[in-house]
């Protein structure tokens, strides 16, 4: 920088004059010297040496040149002057002083300029250092702030997870307390009911003892009177005339049972029927409050077993009392063997008359008890069971009766009783029970291939579900769809699949019903009434049970082909069951061509929407993925209005497939005929947000994979890490309970589309029961006791 400044310095006037003078002298010297040199060269070139030839080719003549010789000479002179060595010039004292002052002044200026330049550089460097320092300070502050924010976010996340964990624990504790409270209330009710029954039985036994004692005293008084009258009127007779004047018994046979024995048996039967009618009301109330179907069934069976044991104890006590009474009477009879035979004949006649009276009273009581009309099928089976019980007990009456005994015929029934009695049922399918043995409670819903009712078994008082099969072509034989459904559902028994008890039939071939265990809810109607969605642990529990049921079906080579939330049932115990096998069928390997129009539209796999005819278990797994999303959001995942709209909704969320991600996609029938809009990205993650973890979204993507060959199976789905991360699946017994919507009057829901080729004509499937033989659904007495009309038959 200093050299550049020296070249820029301003010259003084003296220096300029001296410079001009020096240049002028140099020019004059150069001119003289140039002229001298040019003359020498010309003289040399003009005179050729000996033997030298002039070469005209070497001569270059420049014509019309803008430069003149004088100009070139001047330029050359200037150059020579600048390069010439000048002799030292003589300066005066005054000039030297002036020159020294100039030099000092120049030196000061140079020093000032150097110092200013250095200060400027120092300031620039200082600014740069300050800038760097501030930049580092800002970076440190930003880093500290980011670290603080990260730490704060971690603390907030930990606090949120802690609050969420506390909330879940409080919720679980609350549910546990409620469950224990319900169990305690149930135990208290059962204890009170047992105490009430025991008290009633005790009072009944005391009343029977009083009646038997009263009858015994009356017989003794009457026998004393007869003895007194016969002692005065009738002569003594030999013992052999006892058979002739008696009731037809031989002398060696045992005496008939006392007259109160049939009456006691009939009273016990009346008591049993009263207890059964009480048990019906009690079991109904207990089932409404019970939280689990299995526990309610076990408690019901346990109460019935306890009741049977207590009744057996009563019968043993009554038989022991009767045996004691018989022994006393035999002793009295042995003492009176010496009396006349007329007394014995009158006594036997009195016993026969008392027996007839007791039988008449029993018939009257039975006529009063038979409020609900029963079929002969029920009555015959009941009479056979009563006969077996009487034979097993070995009562004196049954052992003492012979061919000669007189038993009066049953009295003729009145016209009113004839109207109450039902005609004998002749089942169309041998070995199946009649539908008359069930009492209809309400109509639940239409399935794919039939109508479902909630009913009660009249014999066991158990609540069951009756599904009436569609039999529109019964004249051509048994429908293949109904046969396939029965065969499939009987083959696929599993804890997470609806349990089939039996098949019952109506009056003719078009009334066939599947009897299944009653389950309180279906997930579709339950989610419509829930105010809050399922918790993550509850969703995992439901998905695990669903995958277990689907795995069992696929392991047995069964395709369900209609998995949706309305076909998934949930009990009060938190047990999920797969139902409605109207579209199910078996499949084999290699795959065959099936109809592509299966599965309800919202849950239909893309290969079915695009017209594929060869498909396998992957269609069920796509439906499982749609159900997974619906459990999280309580809304259908792809609610399309038509097949084209359904395809567009799937492509919009998952992206349009290609041959790369779906081999064979371009060969599908629908792809060849039409062009779909392009959606390059998968936008499904945005629909769930915080509702689904990364592992859960990974499982969702595997359920909703386009290529069926890469779609996850039910067995692999159960092994996914989503079910092992927190929050873990809850125990089914910890599920909350809701009011059973199926026990209320059916309300038509028009939200979910119907399955293909099923359900469209079934909304009036049970309406013709009012005109023909079969179920009669009475809406005026819904929820009545066993004495209500229930299922009524019309012939």
Swiss-Prot record:
Question: Where does tissue-level expression of this protein occur?
Answer: Expressed ubiquitously. Some evidence of isoform-specific tissue distribution.
Activity regulation text: Phosphorylation at Thr-448 or Tyr-449 inactivates the enzyme, while phosphorylation at Thr-595 activates it.
**Cofactor(s) this protein cannot do without:** Mg(2+)
Give one GO biological process term: regulation of apoptotic process
Q: Give the enzyme class.
A: transferase
Ranges of compositional bias, category Low complexity: 291-302
Report the EC code(s) recorded for this entry. Answer: 2.7.11.22
| Annotated positions of the Phosphoserine modification | 47, 72, 115, 283, 482, 589, 752
Question: What ranges does the record list as Basic residues composition bias?
Answer: 95-113
Statement: the UniProt record of this protein carries the keyword Kinase: yes
User: Which InterPro entries does the protein's record reference?
Assistant: CDK, CDK11/PITSLRE_STKc, Kinase-like_dom_sf, Prot_kinase_dom, Ser/Thr_kinase_AS
Q: Name one GO molecular function term.
A: protein serine kinase activity
Basic and acidic residues composition bias: residue spans:
17-60, 114-131, 138-227, 238-253, 264-276
Cellular component annotations (GO), alphabetically ordered: cyclin-dependent protein kinase holoenzyme complex; cytoplasm; nucleus
Task: Explain what induces or represses this protein's expression.
Answer: Isoform 7 is induced in G2/M phase of the cell cycle.
Chain positions of cross-link Glycyl lysine isopeptide (Lys-Gly) (interchain with G-Cter in SUMO2):
641
Where are the stretches annotated Disordered?
17-412, 733-795
Positions carrying Phosphothreonine are 488, 595, 751
Q: What does this protein do?
A: Plays multiple roles in cell cycle progression, cytokinesis and apoptosis. Involved in pre-mRNA splicing in a kinase activity-dependent manner. Isoform 7 may act as a negative regulator of normal cell cycle progression.
User: Any other noteworthy remark?
Assistant: Duplicated gene. CDK11A and CDK11B encode almost identical protein kinases of 110 kDa that contain at their C-termini the open reading frame of a smaller 58 kDa isoform which is expressed following IRES-mediated alternative initiation of translation.
**Family (UniProt):** Belongs to the protein kinase superfamily. CMGC Ser/Thr protein kinase family. CDC2/CDKX subfamily.
**What name does UniProt use for this protein?**
Cyclin-dependent kinase 11B
